[in-house]
Amino acid sequence: MAVQESAAQLSMALKVQEYPTLKVPYETLNKRFRAAQKNIDRETSHVTMVVAELEKTLSSCSAVDSVVSLLDGVVEKLSVLKRKAMESIQAEDESAKLCKRRIEHLKEHSSDQTAAINMWKKKRMDRMMVEHLLRCGYYNTAVKLARQSEIEDLVNIEMFLTAKEVEESLERQETMTCLAWCHDNKSRLRKMKSCLEFSLRIQEFIELIRQNKRLDAVRHARKHFSQAEGSQLDEVRQVMGMLAFPSDTHISPYKDLLDPARWRMLIQQFRYDNYRLHQLGNNSVFTITLQAGLSAIKTPQCYKEDGTSKNPDCPVCSKSLNKLAQPLPLAHCANSRLVCKISGDVMNENNPPMMLPNGYVYGYNSLLSIRQDDKVVCPRTKEVFNFSQAEKVYIM
Protein backbone atom coordinates (compact mmCIF):
# COMPACT_ATOMS: atom_id res chain seq x y z
CA MET A 1 0.00 0.00 0.00
CA ALA A 2 2.82 2.39 0.90
CA VAL A 3 4.59 1.59 -2.38
CA GLN A 4 1.42 2.36 -4.37
CA GLU A 5 0.96 5.64 -2.49
CA SER A 6 4.58 6.62 -3.14
CA ALA A 7 4.20 5.79 -6.84
CA ALA A 8 1.01 7.88 -7.00
CA GLN A 9 2.77 10.84 -5.37
CA LEU A 10 5.66 10.55 -7.84
CA SER A 11 3.22 10.39 -10.75
CA MET A 12 1.48 13.55 -9.51
CA ALA A 13 4.83 15.31 -9.08
CA LEU A 14 5.73 14.41 -12.66
CA LYS A 15 2.46 15.83 -13.96
CA VAL A 16 3.08 19.11 -12.16
CA GLN A 17 6.81 19.52 -12.73
CA GLU A 18 7.20 17.94 -16.16
CA TYR A 19 4.34 19.79 -17.85
CA PRO A 20 6.71 22.10 -19.80
CA THR A 21 8.77 19.09 -20.91
CA LEU A 22 5.89 17.91 -23.09
CA LYS A 23 3.96 21.13 -23.62
CA VAL A 24 6.69 23.03 -25.47
CA PRO A 25 7.36 20.38 -28.18
CA TYR A 26 3.61 19.77 -28.49
CA GLU A 27 3.01 23.47 -29.14
CA THR A 28 5.83 23.41 -31.70
CA LEU A 29 4.20 20.41 -33.41
CA ASN A 30 0.83 22.17 -33.38
CA LYS A 31 2.36 25.33 -34.86
CA ARG A 32 4.14 23.41 -37.62
CA PHE A 33 0.96 21.51 -38.44
CA ARG A 34 -1.00 24.74 -38.89
CA ALA A 35 1.82 26.24 -40.98
CA ALA A 36 1.95 23.11 -43.15
CA GLN A 37 -1.80 23.24 -43.67
CA LYS A 38 -1.62 26.87 -44.81
CA ASN A 39 1.34 26.22 -47.13
CA ILE A 40 -0.25 23.19 -48.77
CA ASP A 41 -3.61 24.97 -49.17
CA ARG A 42 -1.87 27.94 -50.78
CA GLU A 43 0.20 25.85 -53.18
CA THR A 44 -2.82 23.68 -54.02
CA SER A 45 -4.78 26.78 -54.99
CA HIS A 46 -1.90 27.82 -57.28
CA VAL A 47 -1.96 24.40 -58.95
CA THR A 48 -5.74 24.60 -59.34
CA MET A 49 -5.45 28.00 -61.02
CA VAL A 50 -2.87 26.90 -63.61
CA VAL A 51 -4.79 23.67 -64.31
CA ALA A 52 -7.98 25.67 -64.88
CA GLU A 53 -6.10 27.97 -67.23
CA LEU A 54 -4.71 24.94 -69.08
CA GLU A 55 -8.18 23.42 -69.47
CA LYS A 56 -9.49 26.73 -70.78
CA THR A 57 -6.68 26.92 -73.31
CA LEU A 58 -7.26 23.34 -74.48
CA SER A 59 -10.98 23.97 -74.97
CA SER A 60 -10.22 26.94 -77.23
CA CYS A 61 -7.87 24.93 -79.49
CA SER A 62 -4.92 27.22 -78.92
CA ALA A 63 -1.46 26.83 -80.37
CA VAL A 64 0.80 24.00 -79.22
CA ASP A 65 3.40 26.40 -77.86
CA SER A 66 0.84 27.94 -75.50
CA VAL A 67 -0.23 24.52 -74.25
CA VAL A 68 3.38 23.43 -73.69
CA SER A 69 4.09 26.64 -71.78
CA LEU A 70 1.05 26.09 -69.56
CA LEU A 71 2.05 22.45 -69.01
CA ASP A 72 5.47 23.62 -67.89
CA GLY A 73 3.73 25.97 -65.47
CA VAL A 74 1.63 23.11 -64.09
CA VAL A 75 4.74 20.94 -63.63
CA GLU A 76 6.52 23.80 -61.87
CA LYS A 77 3.60 24.42 -59.50
CA LEU A 78 3.31 20.69 -58.77
CA SER A 79 7.04 20.55 -58.02
CA VAL A 80 6.71 23.47 -55.60
CA LEU A 81 3.70 21.79 -53.96
CA LYS A 82 5.63 18.53 -53.60
CA ARG A 83 8.68 20.29 -52.13
CA LYS A 84 6.62 22.34 -49.66
CA ALA A 85 4.65 19.23 -48.63
CA MET A 86 7.83 17.22 -48.04
CA GLU A 87 9.41 20.04 -46.02
CA SER A 88 6.27 20.43 -43.91
CA ILE A 89 5.93 16.69 -43.32
CA GLN A 90 9.60 16.44 -42.34
CA ALA A 91 9.24 19.32 -39.86
CA GLU A 92 6.11 17.74 -38.34
CA ASP A 93 7.82 14.35 -38.16
CA GLU A 94 10.77 15.86 -36.26
CA SER A 95 8.42 17.47 -33.73
CA ALA A 96 6.41 14.26 -33.32
CA LYS A 97 9.59 12.23 -32.74
CA LEU A 98 10.72 14.78 -30.15
CA CYS A 99 7.41 14.43 -28.26
CA LYS A 100 7.74 10.65 -28.39
CA ARG A 101 11.34 10.77 -27.15
CA ARG A 102 10.37 12.88 -24.16
CA ILE A 103 7.42 10.65 -23.29
CA GLU A 104 9.72 7.63 -23.36
CA HIS A 105 12.16 9.47 -21.10
CA LEU A 106 9.44 10.27 -18.54
CA LYS A 107 8.31 6.64 -18.53
CA GLU A 108 11.78 5.59 -17.41
CA HIS A 109 11.01 6.80 -13.87
CA SER A 110 8.86 3.68 -13.31
CA SER A 111 11.70 1.26 -14.06
CA ASP A 112 12.25 -1.68 -11.69
CA GLN A 113 16.03 -1.31 -11.84
CA THR A 114 17.63 0.95 -9.24
CA ALA A 115 20.51 1.90 -11.53
CA ALA A 116 18.07 3.00 -14.26
CA ILE A 117 16.06 5.10 -11.79
CA ASN A 118 19.21 6.77 -10.46
CA MET A 119 20.31 7.56 -14.02
CA TRP A 120 16.87 9.01 -14.75
CA LYS A 121 17.06 11.20 -11.63
CA LYS A 122 20.50 12.42 -12.70
CA LYS A 123 19.18 13.36 -16.14
CA ARG A 124 16.18 15.04 -14.57
CA MET A 125 18.41 17.16 -12.35
CA ASP A 126 20.54 18.10 -15.34
CA ARG A 127 17.42 19.08 -17.28
CA MET A 128 16.29 21.34 -14.44
CA MET A 129 19.72 22.96 -14.28
CA VAL A 130 19.84 23.53 -18.06
CA GLU A 131 16.44 25.24 -18.04
CA HIS A 132 17.40 27.38 -15.05
CA LEU A 133 20.67 28.43 -16.70
CA LEU A 134 18.82 29.32 -19.91
CA ARG A 135 16.35 31.47 -17.98
CA CYS A 136 19.24 33.23 -16.23
CA GLY A 137 20.97 33.96 -19.54
CA TYR A 138 23.89 31.51 -19.22
CA TYR A 139 23.28 30.08 -22.69
CA ASN A 140 26.76 28.70 -23.43
CA THR A 141 26.95 26.94 -20.06
CA ALA A 142 23.47 25.48 -20.55
CA VAL A 143 24.28 24.18 -24.03
CA LYS A 144 27.55 22.61 -22.82
CA LEU A 145 25.79 20.89 -19.91
CA ALA A 146 23.03 19.58 -22.19
CA ARG A 147 25.60 18.25 -24.67
CA GLN A 148 27.74 16.69 -21.95
CA SER A 149 24.72 15.00 -20.33
CA GLU A 150 23.30 13.95 -23.74
CA ILE A 151 19.92 15.57 -23.05
CA GLU A 152 19.79 18.06 -25.91
CA ASP A 153 16.52 16.55 -27.15
CA LEU A 154 15.01 16.66 -23.64
CA VAL A 155 15.36 20.41 -23.00
CA ASN A 156 13.89 23.46 -24.72
CA ILE A 157 17.16 25.00 -25.89
CA GLU A 158 15.81 26.10 -29.29
CA MET A 159 12.99 28.09 -27.70
CA PHE A 160 15.34 29.95 -25.37
CA LEU A 161 17.91 30.61 -28.11
CA THR A 162 15.16 32.14 -30.24
CA ALA A 163 14.17 34.29 -27.27
CA LYS A 164 17.84 35.23 -26.83
CA GLU A 165 17.98 36.62 -30.38
CA VAL A 166 14.85 38.68 -29.78
CA GLU A 167 16.07 40.04 -26.44
CA GLU A 168 19.48 40.93 -27.85
CA SER A 169 17.84 42.84 -30.71
CA LEU A 170 15.72 44.77 -28.20
CA GLU A 171 18.85 45.55 -26.19
CA ARG A 172 20.27 47.04 -29.40
CA GLN A 173 17.05 49.08 -29.59
CA GLU A 174 15.85 47.25 -32.71
CA THR A 175 12.28 46.05 -33.21
CA MET A 176 12.36 44.03 -36.44
CA THR A 177 13.33 40.68 -34.89
CA CYS A 178 10.67 40.95 -32.20
CA LEU A 179 8.04 42.03 -34.75
CA ALA A 180 8.93 38.99 -36.88
CA TRP A 181 8.45 36.79 -33.80
CA CYS A 182 5.05 38.43 -33.22
CA HIS A 183 4.09 37.71 -36.84
CA ASP A 184 5.10 34.04 -36.55
CA ASN A 185 2.90 33.66 -33.46
CA LYS A 186 0.19 36.12 -34.48
CA SER A 187 -2.86 33.91 -33.93
CA ARG A 188 -1.74 32.67 -30.51
CA LEU A 189 -0.79 36.15 -29.33
CA ARG A 190 -4.18 37.46 -30.44
CA LYS A 191 -5.93 34.77 -28.37
CA MET A 192 -3.75 35.76 -25.40
CA LYS A 193 -4.75 39.41 -25.95
CA SER A 194 -1.07 40.33 -26.02
CA CYS A 195 -0.15 44.01 -26.41
CA LEU A 196 3.48 43.35 -27.32
CA GLU A 197 3.21 44.31 -31.01
CA PHE A 198 1.33 47.50 -30.10
CA SER A 199 4.03 48.37 -27.55
CA LEU A 200 6.70 47.87 -30.20
CA ARG A 201 4.88 50.18 -32.61
CA ILE A 202 4.60 52.79 -29.85
CA GLN A 203 8.35 52.51 -29.26
CA GLU A 204 9.03 52.94 -32.98
CA PHE A 205 6.96 56.14 -32.90
CA ILE A 206 8.95 57.38 -29.88
CA GLU A 207 12.26 56.67 -31.63
CA LEU A 208 11.13 58.68 -34.68
CA ILE A 209 10.34 61.59 -32.35
CA ARG A 210 13.75 61.18 -30.70
CA GLN A 211 15.37 61.42 -34.15
CA ASN A 212 13.24 64.49 -34.96
CA LYS A 213 11.51 62.68 -37.86
CA ARG A 214 8.07 64.01 -37.02
CA LEU A 215 6.49 63.58 -40.46
CA ASP A 216 7.61 59.95 -40.49
CA ALA A 217 6.15 59.60 -37.00
CA VAL A 218 2.77 60.89 -38.24
CA ARG A 219 2.80 58.43 -41.16
CA HIS A 220 3.75 55.65 -38.76
CA ALA A 221 0.84 56.57 -36.47
CA ARG A 222 -1.65 56.61 -39.35
CA LYS A 223 -0.48 53.18 -40.47
CA HIS A 224 -0.37 51.37 -37.13
CA PHE A 225 -2.61 53.23 -34.67
CA SER A 226 -5.80 53.71 -36.70
CA GLN A 227 -7.41 50.60 -35.18
CA ALA A 228 -6.48 51.40 -31.57
CA GLU A 229 -9.29 51.41 -29.01
CA GLY A 230 -9.82 51.38 -25.27
CA SER A 231 -6.67 51.75 -23.19
CA GLN A 232 -4.54 51.59 -26.33
CA LEU A 233 -6.33 54.66 -27.71
CA ASP A 234 -5.50 56.55 -24.51
CA GLU A 235 -1.84 55.59 -24.91
CA VAL A 236 -1.88 56.73 -28.54
CA ARG A 237 -3.31 60.10 -27.52
CA GLN A 238 -0.56 60.48 -24.95
CA VAL A 239 2.31 59.70 -27.33
CA MET A 240 0.82 61.91 -30.05
CA GLY A 241 1.32 64.81 -27.66
CA MET A 242 5.06 64.31 -28.12
CA LEU A 243 4.76 65.93 -31.55
CA ALA A 244 4.36 69.30 -29.83
CA PHE A 245 7.48 69.01 -27.63
CA PRO A 246 11.23 68.80 -28.35
CA SER A 247 12.96 65.46 -27.95
CA ASP A 248 14.90 66.71 -24.91
CA THR A 249 11.80 67.87 -23.03
CA HIS A 250 11.70 67.60 -19.24
CA ILE A 251 7.92 67.70 -19.07
CA SER A 252 6.21 64.60 -17.74
CA PRO A 253 4.95 62.18 -19.07
CA TYR A 254 6.89 62.81 -22.30
CA LYS A 255 10.22 62.71 -20.49
CA ASP A 256 9.35 59.23 -19.19
CA LEU A 257 8.30 58.07 -22.66
CA LEU A 258 11.69 59.11 -24.03
CA ASP A 259 13.54 57.24 -21.29
CA PRO A 260 15.72 54.45 -22.82
CA ALA A 261 14.67 52.25 -19.89
CA ARG A 262 11.48 51.53 -21.84
CA TRP A 263 13.49 49.06 -23.90
CA ARG A 264 14.09 47.03 -20.74
CA MET A 265 10.32 47.04 -20.16
CA LEU A 266 9.82 45.69 -23.70
CA ILE A 267 12.26 42.86 -22.97
CA GLN A 268 10.31 41.98 -19.83
CA GLN A 269 7.03 42.13 -21.75
CA PHE A 270 8.40 39.86 -24.49
CA ARG A 271 9.72 37.39 -21.91
CA TYR A 272 6.36 37.31 -20.15
CA ASP A 273 4.45 36.72 -23.41
CA ASN A 274 6.95 34.09 -24.55
CA TYR A 275 6.45 32.13 -21.33
CA ARG A 276 2.67 32.45 -21.62
CA LEU A 277 2.80 31.38 -25.27
CA HIS A 278 4.51 28.11 -24.27
CA GLN A 279 2.53 27.90 -21.00
CA LEU A 280 5.64 28.17 -18.82
CA GLY A 281 5.71 29.65 -15.33
CA ASN A 282 7.66 32.76 -14.40
CA ASN A 283 10.02 30.63 -12.28
CA SER A 284 12.06 27.65 -13.42
CA VAL A 285 11.18 24.13 -12.30
CA PHE A 286 14.53 24.04 -10.49
CA THR A 287 13.61 27.14 -8.45
CA ILE A 288 10.15 25.78 -7.60
CA THR A 289 11.53 22.38 -6.62
CA LEU A 290 14.28 23.92 -4.49
CA GLN A 291 11.83 26.22 -2.70
CA ALA A 292 9.41 23.34 -2.06
CA GLY A 293 12.23 21.24 -0.61
CA LEU A 294 13.51 24.05 1.62
CA SER A 295 10.02 24.83 2.87
CA ALA A 296 9.42 21.14 3.67
CA ILE A 297 12.35 21.06 6.13
CA LYS A 298 12.34 24.65 7.38
CA THR A 299 11.79 25.07 11.14
CA PRO A 300 12.03 28.01 13.57
CA GLN A 301 15.25 26.46 14.91
CA CYS A 302 16.97 27.30 11.60
CA TYR A 303 16.72 31.02 12.43
CA LYS A 304 17.65 31.17 16.12
CA GLU A 305 20.06 34.08 16.60
CA ASP A 306 22.33 32.26 19.04
CA GLY A 307 23.22 29.73 16.34
CA THR A 308 23.46 26.86 18.85
CA SER A 309 20.28 25.18 17.59
CA LYS A 310 21.38 24.99 13.96
CA ASN A 311 22.03 21.56 12.49
CA PRO A 312 25.14 21.28 10.28
CA ASP A 313 23.35 18.62 8.19
CA CYS A 314 20.29 20.82 7.58
CA PRO A 315 20.28 22.60 4.17
CA VAL A 316 18.18 25.47 5.55
CA CYS A 317 20.71 26.06 8.34
CA SER A 318 23.54 26.37 5.83
CA LYS A 319 24.77 29.87 5.07
CA SER A 320 24.09 29.68 1.33
CA LEU A 321 20.45 28.59 1.59
CA ASN A 322 19.40 30.17 4.89
CA LYS A 323 18.70 33.57 3.36
CA LEU A 324 17.01 32.05 0.31
CA ALA A 325 14.58 30.12 2.49
CA GLN A 326 13.76 33.08 4.76
CA PRO A 327 10.58 34.24 2.93
CA LEU A 328 9.29 30.67 2.54
CA PRO A 329 6.67 29.19 4.90
CA LEU A 330 7.65 26.81 7.67
CA ALA A 331 7.27 23.07 7.19
CA HIS A 332 3.79 21.70 7.84
CA CYS A 333 4.07 19.00 10.47
CA ALA A 334 0.87 17.32 11.72
CA ASN A 335 2.81 15.11 14.17
CA SER A 336 5.85 16.54 15.94
CA ARG A 337 9.10 14.59 16.06
CA LEU A 338 11.77 15.21 18.67
CA VAL A 339 15.32 14.87 17.38
CA CYS A 340 18.32 14.51 19.66
CA LYS A 341 20.83 17.35 19.36
CA ILE A 342 23.77 15.03 20.00
CA SER A 343 23.09 12.08 17.68
CA GLY A 344 20.42 13.42 15.34
CA ASP A 345 18.29 10.35 16.12
CA VAL A 346 14.55 10.55 16.71
CA MET A 347 13.55 10.44 20.37
CA ASN A 348 10.75 7.91 20.92
CA GLU A 349 9.86 4.99 23.16
CA ASN A 350 13.14 3.26 22.25
CA ASN A 351 15.16 6.42 22.82
CA PRO A 352 13.10 8.46 25.33
CA PRO A 353 13.80 12.19 25.76
CA MET A 354 15.68 13.00 28.96
CA MET A 355 15.87 16.51 30.46
CA LEU A 356 18.92 17.69 32.37
CA PRO A 357 18.52 20.09 35.34
CA ASN A 358 19.43 23.06 33.08
CA GLY A 359 16.35 22.37 30.90
CA TYR A 360 18.06 20.94 27.82
CA VAL A 361 16.65 17.69 26.44
CA TYR A 362 18.65 14.85 24.84
CA GLY A 363 18.00 11.26 23.86
CA TYR A 364 18.57 8.56 26.47
CA ASN A 365 20.95 6.65 24.19
CA SER A 366 23.04 9.78 23.61
CA LEU A 367 23.38 10.46 27.34
CA LEU A 368 24.50 6.88 27.81
CA SER A 369 27.15 7.30 25.12
CA ILE A 370 28.64 10.43 26.74
CA ARG A 371 28.36 9.24 30.37
CA GLN A 372 31.66 8.97 32.22
CA ASP A 373 31.84 7.92 35.88
CA ASP A 374 28.07 8.42 36.10
CA LYS A 375 28.55 12.04 35.00
CA VAL A 376 27.30 13.74 31.82
CA VAL A 377 28.44 17.06 30.34
CA CYS A 378 25.79 19.18 28.62
CA PRO A 379 27.12 19.82 25.06
CA ARG A 380 25.56 23.28 25.02
CA THR A 381 26.45 24.78 28.41
CA LYS A 382 29.33 22.44 29.40
CA GLU A 383 27.68 21.99 32.82
CA VAL A 384 28.32 18.68 34.58
CA PHE A 385 25.44 16.66 36.09
CA ASN A 386 24.93 13.27 37.62
CA PHE A 387 23.33 10.84 35.18
CA SER A 388 20.61 10.13 37.75
CA GLN A 389 19.57 13.81 37.64
CA ALA A 390 18.24 13.43 34.09
CA GLU A 391 14.46 13.14 34.13
CA LYS A 392 12.28 11.45 31.55
CA VAL A 393 10.09 13.82 29.52
CA TYR A 394 6.51 12.91 28.59
CA ILE A 395 4.83 14.54 25.59
CA MET A 396 1.06 14.92 25.86
UniProtKB/Swiss-Prot annotation:
Q: What does this protein do?
A: Core component of the CTLH E3 ubiquitin-protein ligase complex that selectively accepts ubiquitin from UBE2H and mediates ubiquitination and subsequent proteasomal degradation of the transcription factor HBP1. MAEA and RMND5A are both required for catalytic activity of the CTLH E3 ubiquitin-protein ligase complex. MAEA is required for normal cell proliferation. The CTLH E3 ubiquitin-protein ligase complex is not required for the degradation of enzymes involved in gluconeogenesis, such as FBP1. Plays a role in erythroblast maturation and in the development of mature macrophages.
Stated EC number for the protein is 2.3.2.27
Subunit details for this protein? Answer: Identified in the CTLH complex that contains at least MAEA, RMND5A, GID8, WDR26, and RANBP9 and/or RANBP10 as the catalytic core. Interacts with F-actin.
Major location (coarse): nucleus
GO cellular-component term (any): cytoskeleton
| High-level lineage | Eukaryota, Metazoa, Chordata, Craniata, Vertebrata
Q: Do you know which CDD domains this protein is assigned to? A: RING-Ubox_Emp
Q: What is this protein called?
A: E3 ubiquitin-protein transferase MAEA
Keywords (A to Z) from UniProt: Actin-binding, Cell cycle, Cell division, Cell membrane, Cytoplasm, Cytoskeleton, Erythrocyte maturation, Membrane, Metal-binding, Nucleus, Transferase, Ubl conjugation pathway, Zinc, Zinc-finger
